[in-house]
Amino acid sequence: MDHPQRIASAILGLVLLTIGTACSQNIGDSDLGSKTDTASLHSLRRELEQIRNHFPGDMSIYMKNLSTAEEIALDSDKVYETFSVIKLAIAAELMHQVESGKLSLSDRITTKAADERLPSGVLYALEPGLSPTIKDLLTLMIITSDNEATDLLADKLGRAQVTAYMHALGLANTSIQFSDLDWDRTWLGTLDARYRNARGEQTVNFPFSKYSQAQVEQAFGHTIYDAGIFFGHSTTKEIGRLLEMMASGKLVSKVASELILNIMEKQQVNDRFPRYLKDVRIAHKTGDGQPFIANDVGIIWVKDQPIVLVVFTGHHRGGTAALHDDVARVAALVVRHYGGKLSSDFE
């Protein structure tokens, strides 16, 4: 027979284990607790880790089910180049200034030739002299990732103000400092020094045909990793927090949050998260720096459960199609875990 003290200790240990299991909700970088469906959530984490471990480069994943508070965080505090994902921060500060009365969504900005940016979106292909509203520019910035619209808005708001607002929200690693034109000048100037001070309309007409794809990609990679310039910086966890505020109606205000989400639902770049999803509502924003970086972030509603998902990549070695597919598979695994439908070509 066991000693009574040993039996009491065993019972106490069992009670503490039961309490710990019931209270723990998250699976973070070093926290392997769970909610009620521990084994299932751990299984999803292992599937995501498998994609990440076989990814030829760096990958960070942050996922949170806002209905259950279940959370998975893989390398989620590491700062990455966001590329156009930072446009969500610009959108947030834009709505912050709108609601403070500094500007109106109906205000107009007249485009000039100098505002043109390397092909992204649609404005570069249209004649200067248009006068889109600020809401029009916001929409173009999000759904077509238009860099001309982005610089027009960021110049209007002030990039320091965008960063300051992110910091005020508690997102200390989220920042924007340089314009798209700064970035393009640095990249193109690596290929041809005359473009280091080029005007916008000159960058649009850069003679890429004079250079091999390898030369262009080498210059692009140099600009990302060695030139001391960035389009945007953040972590997957911080962008996840920004999206969570948006989903709960607490980013600036309920009206502002809903407006940004409604625009994100009209996203035109759908080669990542939506790739394998079927009949699923999604609001998302991509960030493009192929073949080295392809990011996607957003909110996916699965059976009325809003799920925040953020995937950042970096230093990818391989083709763009494979890069996009790895990001798409992350979203597919998350959606399948929560009972959502996938397309028949997902394996």
Please state what every model-predicted region is:
Residues A22-E47, I51, I224, G228-E347:
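Structured C-terminal helix/loop/strand segments within mature extracytoplasmic catalytic/sensor domains
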Residues M1-I11:
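Bacterial N-terminal signal peptides that target proteins for export
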Residues E81, S175-V252:
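Active-site-proximal helix/loop microenvironment
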Residues E70, A125-E127, G221-I224, F312-T313:
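A short small-residue
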Residues L14, T144, L169, M246, ...:
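Alpha-helix boundary/capping residues
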Residues I27-L191:
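Active-site-adjacent loops and short helices of periplasmic peptidoglycan-processing enzymes
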Residues A10-G20:
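Bacterial N-terminal signal peptides
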